[in-house]
């Protein structure tokens, strides 16, 4: 796909600790880091060579974000790359650092730093699960990647196993991807390390907790992650990016994105640069804005609607779903819950959506937490079967944010209390030291006075004795 006239790179800055490495009117090369990396932030890299046109703080497109605008020079020049031929000659710590500095994050939607995930799995995980199961219907980006780049993905798996000392790799793939399955079987040579696991096509089979249950029969406990029970899960796109970061020395600047519509007028996979405006992406594929009703980042179930087409492709954007304009408005208003219980039957993580809905309506945050609203994977299966058209996931997301804010506020109060107690203890210790020093000073002064009196008495006694001796003579 040709380069757009502008790239929009959004950098999340929830903690206000992002430090920029570039400034306006500065020339950059493709792969050049735009921010300094730390424990909380992986770097974002320039998707092409060009000029930093503008830097906007707290932009309107996404709240709490920094927006960097790059005008390409169409030369597409890379920075100096440092490929590694034999990764086994390097220490695991060095490889993890390269993955971190290459900006690799979870490309299945989580966007959690892959370097941290690998660090957490060392001495804890015994199995690597390669997630090639599409999270939603119609999305084919993972299948496209695994079909065309399976050899590179297998190398990426070996790199992760070298770092974490994992001895088993399970490649999870859907049963309808027959060509990809046969290609994997043909290329796998180490049968003791790699095992292919064919998953039935059932939504949402690609969710990490559902996938672990399907493959192993084990359930991830509430409030825990798959690593806690010994399974490290990576999306195929993430593993592919890890391979490119180590072997090719290339940071993450592009990804495969599925473009699809509700009427199946268009469906395809494209290599898209991070930061490409969605409006340009659609127009370059001959989609007229006048025929588009809405655009979703993601699939038809879990996709999030966007109103501003100047929004850009993010690292976690695996697909764009388009709905076309219809002659009639088919929007249906929310009705009262009839307690049918259908939502509970279809929930893949065994929650009680109906009960959570009533607790949320009554603002009973204690009960929503006890009933594991934080474990909701936001698959919207409950919404699809609800006869009252209640947007349950919308309520669950709002409740998650409320619980998150409550937790942050409680932690802030705890830290304030700890700081207050520490300060009080310090002041008490200082006062005690002052009193002890004063008492010591007074004791020394008193002892000195007593010594002076004693010396005077002894001197007088001695003089009296001398005078008595003289009088006797």
Curated annotation (Swiss-Prot):
Cofactors, names only: [4Fe-4S] cluster
| Protein's GO biological process | electron transport chain
Positions contributing to [4Fe-4S] cluster 2 binding: 347, 376, 379, 382
Source domain of life is Bacteria
Q: What does this protein do?
A: Part of a membrane-bound complex that couples electron transfer with translocation of ions across the membrane.
Oligomeric form and interacting partners: The complex is composed of six subunits: RnfA, RnfB, RnfC, RnfD, RnfE and RnfG.
Protein name per UniProt: Ion-translocating oxidoreductase complex subunit C
The gene designation is rnfC
């Amino acid at each position: 796909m040709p380069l757009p006239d502008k790239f929009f790179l959004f950098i999340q800055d929830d903690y206000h600790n992002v430090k920029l490495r570039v400034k306006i009117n500065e020339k950059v090369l493709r792969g050049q880091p735009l921010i300094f990396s730390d424990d909380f932030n992986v770097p974002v890299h320039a998707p092409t060579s060009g000029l930093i046109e503008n830097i906007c703080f707290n932009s309107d497109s996404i709240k709490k974000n920094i927006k960097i605008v790059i005008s390409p020079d169409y030369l597409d020049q890379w920075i100096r790359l440092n490929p590694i031929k034999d990764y086994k000659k390097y220490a695991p710590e060095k490889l993890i650092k390269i993955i971190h500095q290459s900006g690799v994050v979870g490309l299945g939607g989580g966007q959690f730093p892959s370097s941290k995930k690998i660090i957490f799995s060392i001495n804890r995980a015994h199995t690597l699960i390669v997630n090639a199961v599409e999270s939603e219907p119609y999305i084919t980006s993972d299948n496209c990647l695994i079909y065309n780049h399976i050899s590179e993905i297998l190398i990426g798996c070996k790199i992760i196993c070298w770092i974490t000392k994992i001895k088993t790799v399970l490649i999870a793939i859907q049963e309808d991807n027959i060509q990809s399955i046969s290609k994997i079987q043909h290329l796998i040579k180490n049968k003791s390390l790699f095992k292919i696991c064919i998953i039935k096509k059932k939504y949402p089979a690609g969710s990490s907790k559902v996938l672990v249950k399907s493959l192993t029969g084990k359930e991830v406990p509430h409030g825990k992650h798959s690593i806690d029970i010994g399974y490290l899960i990576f999306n195929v796109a993430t593993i592919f990016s890890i391979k490119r970061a180590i072997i090719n020395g290339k940071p993450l600047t592009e990804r495969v994105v599925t473009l699809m519509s509700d009427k199946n007028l268009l469906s395809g996979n494209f290599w898209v640069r991070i930061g490409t405006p969605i409006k340009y992406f659609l127009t370059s594929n001959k989609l007229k804005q006048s025929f588009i009703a809405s655009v979703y980042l993601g699939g038809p179930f879990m996709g999030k609607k966007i109103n501003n087409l100047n929004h850009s492709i993010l690292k976690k954007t695996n697909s764009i779903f388009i709905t076309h304009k219809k002659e009639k408005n088919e929007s249906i208003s929310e009705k009262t819950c009839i307690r049918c219980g259908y939502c509970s039957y279809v929930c893949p993580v065994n929650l009680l959506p109906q009960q959570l809905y009533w607790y949320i309506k009554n603002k009973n945050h204690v009960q929503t937490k006890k009933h594991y609203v934080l474990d909701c994977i936001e698959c919207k299966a409950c919404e699809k079967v609800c006869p009252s058209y209640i947007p349950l996931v919308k309520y669950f997301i709002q409740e998650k944010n409320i619980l998150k804010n409550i937790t942050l506020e409680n932690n802030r109060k705890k830290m304030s209390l700890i700081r207050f107690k520490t300060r009080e203890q310090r002041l008490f210790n200082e006062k005690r030291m002052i009193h002890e020093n004063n008492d010591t000073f007074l004791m020394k002064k008193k002892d000195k006075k007593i010594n002076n009196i004693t010396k005077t008495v002894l001197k007088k006694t001695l003089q009296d004795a001398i005078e008595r001796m003289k009088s006797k003579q």
